[in-house]
Curated annotation (Swiss-Prot):
Protein known as: Uridylate kinase
Keywords attached to this entry: ATP-binding, Cytoplasm, Kinase, Nucleotide-binding, Pyrimidine biosynthesis, Transferase
Reaction(s) catalysed by this chain's protein: UMP + ATP = UDP + ADP
Quaternary context: Homohexamer.
Origin species: Roseiflexus sp. (strain RS-1)
Family from the record: Belongs to the UMP kinase family.
């Protein structure tokens, strides 16, 4: 059997990924789908950390645009990610995968507090960890949380799931059919062109800490497994094409 290309990954999923075709809430079918996708790589002995967004439950920017205090809205978004984390934890545990939900905001009755060494130890023991509540601070996105946690737990790569898009394009392919998809792009070029990889703060952090990012379509079954086994899927964003 082939050996995995990556041994420790961080998977970034948007909250909308769990909503399926709905605009809000959690679709049980999507929970089962992502649990199966994670299980496929877990079987290879790959250590998996997951960071979830909360946009299926709370759209913070829309609330801010209507006048809500920004910090208040951001904290509500953090709570939304915890709901998503508990739902995914349940879906994974029903498949027999030991899973720990860890939160950047303490709520001991619900999940473990995020402690870097404890998170790393869970990974070493073969447990999937779901890292919720972003960074625990307002004004930072879950993209920034993914970058920060990837650095802290020494993930080899961030798998950046983008619903409906199979990589990084020169322009929005849904609006510009002739947009070019990149097989590889450097951090600096992605930043200078303002391309949609992750927010600029998170992307700069990944560049400074040399954390490669693979942007891919998670709705193609088996894509996560293909990536960890070394197949080229989506777009690699890094300092060098062979990273």
């Amino acid at each position: 059997m082939a050996e995995p290309r990556y041994r420790r990954i961080l998977l970034k999923l948007s909250g909308e990924a769990l909503a399926g075709k709905g605009t809000h809430s959690i679709d049980p079918n999507m929970l089962d789908y992502y649990a199966e996708e994670i299980e496929r790589v877990h079987r290879h002995g790959v250590q998996v950390a997951v960071v979830l967004g909360g946009g299926n439950i709370w759209r913070g920017n829309q609330a801010i645009a209507r006048g809500m205090d920004a910090a208040q809205s951001h904290y509500m978004g953090m709570l939304a990610t915890i709901i998503n984390a508990l739902a995914l934890q349940d879906a994974l545990e029903r498949r027999g995968i030991f899973t720990r939900a860890m939160t950047a905001i303490k709520m001991d009755e619900v999940a473990e507090p995020y402690i870097r060494r404890r998170a790393t130890r869970h990974l070493e023991k073969g447990r999937v960890i779901i890292l919720a509540a972003g960074t625990g601070n307002p004004y930072f996105t879950t993209d920034s949380a993914a970058a920060l946690r990837a650095a802290e737990v020494h993930a080899e790569v961030i798998l950046m799931a983008k619903n409906g898009v199979d990589g990084v394009y020169s322009a929005d392919p849904r609006r510009y059919p002739d947009a070019k998809r990149f097989e590889y792009i450097s951090y600096m070029e992605a930043l200078s062109r303002g391309l949609t990889v992750m927010d600029s703060t998170a992307l700069t952090f990944c560049m400074d800490n040399n954390i490669p990012i693979i942007v891919f379509d998670p709705l193609t079954p088996g894509n996560i497994e293909r990536i960890v086994m070394g197949e080229h899927v989506g777009t690699l964003v890094s300092s060098h094409p062979s990273q």
